[in-house]
Amino acid sequence: MISKIITSIFGSSNDRTLKRLRKRVAQINKLEPAFEKLTDEELQAKTAEFKQRLADGASLDSLLHEAFATVREASRRVMGMRHFDVQLIGGMVLTNRNIAEMRTGEGKTLTATLPCYLNALTGKGVHVVTVNDYLARRDAETNRPLFEFLGLSVAVNVPGLPNEVKREAYKADITYSTNSELGFDYLRDNLAHAKEDRFQRELHYALVDEVDSILIDEARTPLIISGPAEDATQIYQAIDTIIPHLVQQDKEDTEEYTGEGDFTLDLKNKQAHLTERGMVKVEGILTEMGLMQEGETLYHPVRIALLHHVYAALRAHKLFELNVDYIVKDGEVVIIDEHTGRTMAGRRWSDGLHQAIEAKEKVNIQGENQTVASITYQNYFRLYEKLAGMTGTADTEAFEFQQIYGLDTIVIPTNKPVIRDDRTDLMFKSEPEKFAAIIKDIQECMARQQPVLVGTASVEKSELLSAELTKAGIAHNVLNAKFHAQEAEIVAEAGAPGAVTIATNMAGRGTDIVLGGNWKAEIAKLENPTEEQIEAIKAAWKERYDIVMKAGGLHIIGTERHESRRIDNQLRGRSGRQGDPGSSRFYLSLDDALMRIYLNEGKLNMMRKAFSEEGEAMESKLLTKVIASAQAKVEAHNFDGRKNLLQYDDVANEQRKAIYEQRNYLLETEDISAMIETIRGDVFNRVIDQFIPPQSIEEMWDVAGLEEALKRQFGMELPIQHWLEQENDLHEETLRERIIDIATQEYHAKEEKVGSEVMRNFEKGVMLQNLDELWKEHLSAMDYLRKGIHLRGYAQKDPKQEYKKESFEMFTNMLDLLKSNVISVLSRIQVRSQEEIEEAQRQQETMAQAESENYRTADHQAEAQQSESLTEEQLANLDIGRNDPCPCGSGKKYKHCHGSKARYA
């Protein structure tokens, strides 16, 4: 209450920011008349002028007014579009570490040209990040003429590009790319074995389009590059047959309650748990299958992997649904993004879940993979020196953007007031009643030729509603994961009079729905259209536009509330763009997932009793509060999950940074011999310490053990016992120095044989190979630690602190092992000089020649003996198989000896 009073007096933080930025807009507008008078050449020369001023010490902020005026005037000349004042405000917000909330249709693509141009002047590169390939290509081609007019290069980076093309794309001033490709390229760069193989420059400025989708919805999805692991295909198939025999139980067993079922489900967290009864049942079936021994349990250390497979199969069957969480396409299981409704080709669930679903759907089971490199979007985008984002819906997540990314959210006012009619929700008792009401609403819209966009939460629901519309004889388009390729075409037609379009979540997001249909898309379909054709298309569109405007603009129907208010707002935001009319309404039922999972049974029963007759709709403020309460619970739960993930990933992130910095140092540095010398001293000292403790007396020494260790690990045979017997003044320190000196001398002797350049390259190769292999194993070990660390809570220990402590110990152990492995390989390697190699080659050639002469001599002798012992006539009379030994005694098969002669005869 007090905060509202203060806000009403002083204005909100957002209002104060906008007030300050409007003053700067006035400064930019003052420059406009002067910039309009510039010739094209003078306007283009501004880019070089700005770059020189930056080089002379000017700041980007000091150039902002002139730079924005330059872009606005260039855009007017090249693209026929002049930036509105609110777009200038958006551009200023995006220049710094902020998120701009701009409503759908307010021109985010054009707004982005302002901060992109300004930040590209530094020459460090700008990355414009989009959610899919189509938008990356579209936005790049849309803005390319403007940027190239101003002397900046533009490139697109999408999956499947040849390495050289990708490398050039990153050298461009402005690179349009998808979020996943940027992350994967970063990981690939940190797996490269030569600096020339890397793609990215230093990460300078990223402008993320649909920032909420990328930094929040996909925040929990790690980017993973993996390699093949142990194959367990047959186990997945065997365990898949067990699940149909198991019975679900409503709630967990307790001291007071023991159920009759085999497993319970946690729908909120998508987890499954075996009951005590279920555990015994599964163990019995596995024993019958021969996968376990009689008397063994699933918690036996040897069998714990089987339990992992059982839980993966349970989740696959009971918690992941076809056409909701995934589709089967061309014999492969393809994940559906729960937030966008789009398929995520190439992505796979981890922990054996994907293989379990493949077994369930009876498709080819692909092998499990081991993580080679991974990073979350949260940590990848925090690597950029400057990060900004834009979206139509960010204000509801402003707290999370600030907490996790340090980004402030500024709501940009619309150019024209929003006049969309957002109607109150209608609640129905069951889903069939809800669908009947939706169909009635659609029919009413079609009668007045008003276009309708129907938003659904899953592919399954979109197909179910599509079937109902088909039954009712209503023509419509479906936009979901199965029809991803037709996305742009379907969206282009969605604003036509009487058009009905069903879309999952925010499929089609990023593409405006133009009232009356998209006339530009119609023209694009024609080859070399004439002026008459273009004018005819525009005239036809104007007629359709007028019809739609009269009917009330685009009508949005939500078939259920989403887990987040933000996604509901995104759906609503498709209508009422740029001051157009429009309307929206959500239709709900007590069967909806949000109601079932997040409202308790008592509230649901109370609401069921409120319905007196079939088909009755309920709308009230209480209903709105109940729904808002459920969504708030989900948002809080999801935020906690993302924050928790980040806290754990931050531990791994510090280690990742250290490893990747070391890796980049190795790639950039030509000579690492000084590092090798230091490591050699550390490794030998550590080995010697095990057998001869520092400052210890001779009776405590294990000399034989030290001799054996040096031989085994470094290939060094040293008579240490003999030295000690012969030299009375040899003590612990001098002995240590002698061993390390001999190791160093032997290594330098090898270097003299092959040359320093060869040895330097070999050192780098050994270091990189061992670093990559051990890092891969470390990631796997960290993953195992992460999965089980929550159990420390039962011992009254903080799991996060325990994870930090143990992961640090694992990391230091890995580094120690890396040093040992590298020195061991370098010490044991046998090298030969060029003269020795040439001599060895000469000896091999001589031996080969001698062997060849011996074979020829032996053949001649054998033939002579054969001709003496058996005549051709005698051999021809014998009944000999072609593969039998020749009776002449040569030892060859008959077909290769006298058999061949007989055949030719």
UniProtKB/Swiss-Prot annotation:
Polar residues biased stretches: 863-874
Keywords: ATP-binding, Cell inner membrane, Cell membrane, Cytoplasm, Membrane, Metal-binding, Nucleotide-binding, Protein transport, Translocase, Translocation, Transport, Zinc
An example Gene Ontology molecular-function term: protein-exporting ATPase activity
CDD domains: DEXDc_SecA, SF2_C_secA
One BP term from GO: protein transport by the Sec complex
Topology versus the membrane: Peripheral membrane protein
HAMAP family: SecA
Protein name per its UniProtKB record: Protein translocase subunit SecA
Organism: Actinobacillus pleuropneumoniae serotype 7 (strain AP76)
